[in-house]
Amino acid sequence: MEPLHIINVYPETISDGFGVRYAIYLAGCTHHCRGCHNPGSWSPVAGEPLTELILSRIVAEINDNPILDGITISGGDPFYNPFALLALLRRLKEETHKNVWCYTGYTYESLLKDETRRPCLDYIDTLVDGPVSYTHLRAH
């Protein structure tokens, strides 16, 4: 299994879902959405490999922080490497018991039809899905 690569972690953020969240940004994306806020994440080898040591540190940081409401997985596209994502999600849910948000360029419907990606949905509480689109945004 190809290892996940982490671009960045934000131990406390209010920008990646409701409440205070621990955000993990993963590398790898094939969508290449126009207006992407993180094009440096498209390469699957950007950042650093997610080692057991790094993952253990992340789990400990999450469990040691009483103000966290949950975990957010973003990127890139977390579903770029679905088998490694599944292992990560399973470990985070089992060891932290936090709710998990995941941002992806895939639609929910396409993930349901994809046998390699669908199992990840069992460990995601909130899915923010679909490609980035700025056609419906207006400044007020």
Predicted segments with their positions:
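Conserved small/polar residues in nucleotide/adenosyl-binding loops
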Residues: T135-H140
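Short glycine- and Lys/Arg-enriched binding-loop motifs that mark or flank ligand-binding interfaces
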Residues: T13-S15, I71-T72, T126
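Short, cysteine/histidine-rich loop/knuckle motifs that typically chelate Zn2+
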Residues: G35
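Short, flexible active-site-adjacent loop segments at beta-strand->alpha-helix junctions, enriched
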Residues: T30, D77, Y106, V132-S133
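Structural recognition of alpha->loop->beta junctions
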Residues: D114-Y134
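N-terminal pre-triad scaffold of radical SAM enzymes
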Residues: H5-H32
